[in-house]
Amino acid sequence: MAFPAPAFSLANLLNGSYGVDTPEDVERLRSEQREEAAAACRNYRPLPAVDVSESVTEDAHSLRTPDGAPAEAVSDEFVTYGAEDYLEKSDDELLVAFETMVKPMRIGQLWCPAFNKCSFISSIAMARALLLAPRTSHRTMKCFEDLVAAIYTKSDFYYSEECEADDAQIDISSRDVPGYSFEPWSRTSGFEPPPICEACDMIMYQCPCFDFNALKKSCAERTFADDYVIEGLDGVVDNATLLSNLGPFLVPVKCQYEKCPTPTIAIPPDLNRATDRVDINLVQSICDSTLPTHSNYDDSFHQVFVESADYSIDLDHVRLRQSDLIAKIPDSGHMIPVLNTGSGHKRVGTTKEVLTAIKKRNADVPELGDSVNLSRLSKAVAERFFISYINGNSLASSNFVNVVSNFHDYMEKWKSSGLSYDDLPDLHAENLQFYDHMIKSDVKPVVSDTLNIDRPVPATITYHKKSITSQFSPLFTALFERFQRCLRERIILPVGKISSLEMAGFDVKNKHCLEIDLSKFDKSQGEFHLLIQEHILNGLGCPAPITKWWCDFHRFSYIRDRRAGVGMPISFQRRTGDAFTYFGNTIVTMAEFAWCYDTDQFEKLLFSGDDSLGFSLLPPVGDPSKFTTLFNMEAKVMEPAVPYICSKFLLSDEFGNTFSVPDPLREVQRLGTKKIPYSDNDEFLFAHFMSFVDRLKFLDRMSQSCIDQLSIFFELKYKKSGEEAALMLGAFKKYTANFQSYKELYYSDRRQCELINSFCSTEFRVERVNSNKQRKKYGIERRCNDKRRTPTGSYGGGEEAETKVSQTESTGTRSQKSQRESAFKSQTVPLPTVLSSRWFGTDRVMPPCERGGVTRA
């Protein structure tokens, strides 16, 4: 009789009749379970008995009773006896029994086979009945637990014959597959207790002894992947989630790892960095992606086009003298670069080329400034200069030093060029207003993508002779050293012996940068700038007569290019090659900067020529428009500003020290230069290699943090991929390693023959026999009674000539003997050999067979 479940109500809830199993309900449920188990057992009909031989396998999905077993169903008493113990158990206890007997395979949250309460109890009842039934088979029946699993999974009731032969009762249903092992999975909450500090008995994440930053650093230096290789991963949980210790919310991660083999060669930690192999094709691909207009640039005939095409130019007060032009001196050729980086050929100072350069660099002076009182305002700018930059006490206590020693150093430096003390002129007898002029044969690398539409114009140099410069240079050098000693601590001029771009204890990160780009700096300077320089030089202690004299012959001057036959007058603008060029440009830039910005807001200020860079904690405040309205300069505030000055990036290492890194984009362009002269012993190429190594000496300081800084600054400045800058550093590391690697970047179109012999003879003999027929062909037939001596050249004719070449004799007529000839002279070839005369320097046109000679050794 089924009892209805109590209805939900407040009264039933308070008296406990709702939601609580009464004894009557428990008895009712147990009787229902017994009836279901008995019905399942009565409905079970096993298959008839089948004779099974050793060669025939049983059907895994068939169930049969032992031979001779009764065909009728198992009696109910056995079913009641076998099931009553498990009918009284709870669901959790049945699950535990199911896992113990059937041993299901867990796949995620699923079991295979799935749990079925009725089928499991029926299997238990059937196993009890089979164990109590008469034994008629000669095979060994499984034990109770394995028999329950076999009935539940409908597999064989008996052990395999292999196990019987070995007298070992092995459970074939335990699924021991070779290479895999399956164990029951226990339910866990996933909570991992936090580590406890031994010192203060607190959680290590909360105690003061726990250094979390050190833990992060150690994890960053060496990770789990350094010792183990992950083979498989069922789930992914990052380190941040694991460290947060979410407890039961964490899903267990199952990983399989294999221990890495111990390396046979220990790699230093500073070299244990994954890098790509650098080759010439990789460097060229970097150039193609970073400089798209440079890869196909070839200016081999650009100057020819300029010289042969029509030419129109507008200049005032220019003088042309085409009667005594200096012809071009032929050179010995140049090395050809393998990389195509947009580098141009050397410019020749022809008339048209010089006029084009003068038009851009010296003529067309901009007039952007307003009308001001020059004398009064120049004094005010000079006073602001001294207040902003100069330490008055240091200036008062310092004096000129090393003027005479600087003079002797200059004379020794240019002694090889023919400069001597006897050639020094009387400056009062010289017209110092006359300047020589020339163009720079090397064009500055172009970093903008404009080579497809614009041809770079070379820079110009306006200079005095060395005999005149030698008398002014020592004075200005000593004055500049005194100026550096009197500067405030935050002012840096990266030149000379006492200052550089290396700044210890200063970090460029988390700073605001201010970079002012001044265009047309040299020719934009006028009388106002000259007066500012005069006041500053007098304030620094330069003798007033020398200052006045120097400024007077800079007011109006005349420049002339002797090679091109061009001359023109100029006034006030900067002379780009005299003794005061760098010093004058630097103090003009500093004076303009101090007038436009308050220098006290900057932590560091760097000046070099027309370049300036400032660092401040707050955004700098000033009026950059005064560069144009007052100082007649085309100024541009660089945005976004990066620490960049003198074509170098400023980076900071992990210790807070700042160092300079040359611009990778310009250095890559220099790898494709076309201005290296050719030489037999590669002396000019080696000089360029040493210069390249000196510029890139910073590579040993480039850590991963510095590389990341450089990539960010590179991307901000050029709007190009920062990853290319890191690849450029890899190329620089390879080509600075040794000279042989650097030589891969250049080749020569000259025919170079390397003679290699491994024979040990002490003498080399060459015998040449010329036929009369071939001598007539080349017009060298002589009469028999001709007494003139036969030339002793390599193939000079004669009936028979015998030449002996030893280690001490010369093999040719070259004045400069190469290493290949010296190696050739020290060897002997005992086999028949044909020697080309071009190797010996006497005939560079025809081989010996065409000159009528038969050569045998």
Curated annotation (Swiss-Prot):
Comp. bias intervals (Polar residues): 804-816
Biased composition (Basic and acidic residues): 780-789
Catalytic activity: RNA(n) + a ribonucleoside 5'-triphosphate = RNA(n+1) + diphosphate
SUPFAM superfamilies per record: DNA/RNA polymerases
Pfam families membership: RdRP_2 (PF00978)
GO biological processes: DNA-templated transcription; positive stranded viral RNA replication
E.C. numbers: 2.7.7.48
Domain RdRp catalytic: 511-624
Keyword Hydrolase tagged: no
Sorted UniProt keywords: Nucleotide-binding, Nucleotidyltransferase, RNA-directed RNA polymerase, Transferase, Viral RNA replication
Keyword Cell membrane among record annotations: no
Top-level taxon in the UniProt lineage: Viruses
InterPro entries hit by this protein: Bromoviridae_RdRp (IPR047309), DNA/RNA_pol_sf (IPR043502), RNA-dep_RNA_pol_alsuvir (IPR001788), RNA-dir_pol_PSvirus (IPR007094)
CDD domains: Bromoviridae_RdRp (cd23252)
Region (Disordered): 780-829
Gene Ontology MF annotations: nucleotide binding; RNA binding; RNA-directed RNA polymerase activity
Quaternary assembly: Interacts with replication protein 1a.
The protein's role, per its UniProt record: RNA-dependent RNA polymerase which replicates the viral genome composed of 3 RNA segments, RNA1, RNA2 and RNA3.
Family: Belongs to the ssRNA positive-strand viruses RNA-directed RNA polymerase family.
Protein name: RNA-directed RNA polymerase 2a
Biological source species: Cucumber mosaic virus (strain Y) (CMV)
Source taxonomy: Viruses, Riboviria, Orthornavirae, Kitrinoviricota, Alsuviricetes
